[in-house]
Design a protein with these regions (language model features):
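Terminal targeting signals and extreme-terminal segments of soluble enzymes
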Residues: 1-164
């Protein structure tokens, strides 16, 4: 057992997801680095995340022209993919128990048009954690203005790629 006078492992202490490292270009933020090329996650682009107090985390996306719809704003599918990923990264930063989860539901309200070129910040709140589920809610802001609100439920599963 570790001596209580030892400094805690920062990555465990702040609730940062496993495998995350401090982002050199954004002090105070963490990242998993680049997602595997050609993966669905890679289409979202670089994700940053950080704890934001007890039960809260923030996840950041950098939308580009690739995330736009034909009307010139961010495509709803790209926004919902980001929110889905933010529930995991932001939820872990908020103190969600470590484990493998799948999304059971995600409800998104589109409040304002998001635009490329300015970061999206998903402010994630862990509302409740049970043995098998995590209940989350949040607001995605761009330039400090709310663009999307969401609620979602994640189900903890026993092993990856196994039936729930």
């Amino acid at each position: 057992m570790a001596d209580s006078s030892e400094a805690p492992d920062l990555m465990e202490d702040v609730g940062v997801p496993t495998g995350a490292t401090p982002d050199a270009d954004n002090p105070g933020w963490y990242s998993w680095g680049d997602f595997p090329r050609g993966s669905f996650a890679a289409a979202t682009g670089r994700l940053l995340f950080k704890p934001d107090g007890p039960g809260k985390g923030i996840c950041r996306m950098f939308p580009t022209e690739l995330h736009m719809n034909m009307g010139g704003s961010l495509h709803g599918g790209s926004v919902m993919s980001f929110i889905d990923m933010a529930m995991f990264a932001g939820g872990l930063c908020a103190g969600m128990e470590r484990g493998h989860y799948v999304t059971l539901d995600l409800t998104t309200h589109f409040l304002a048009r998001g635009r490329p070129g300015s970061p999206l910040d998903a402010h994630v709140e862990l509302v409740k954690q049970t043995r098998g589920h995590a209940f989350l809610q949040g607001v995605v802001r761009q330039n400090d203005q709310p663009c999307y609100s969401f609620t979602g439920t994640l189900k903890r599963i026993r092993e990856r790629n196994a039936p729930a």
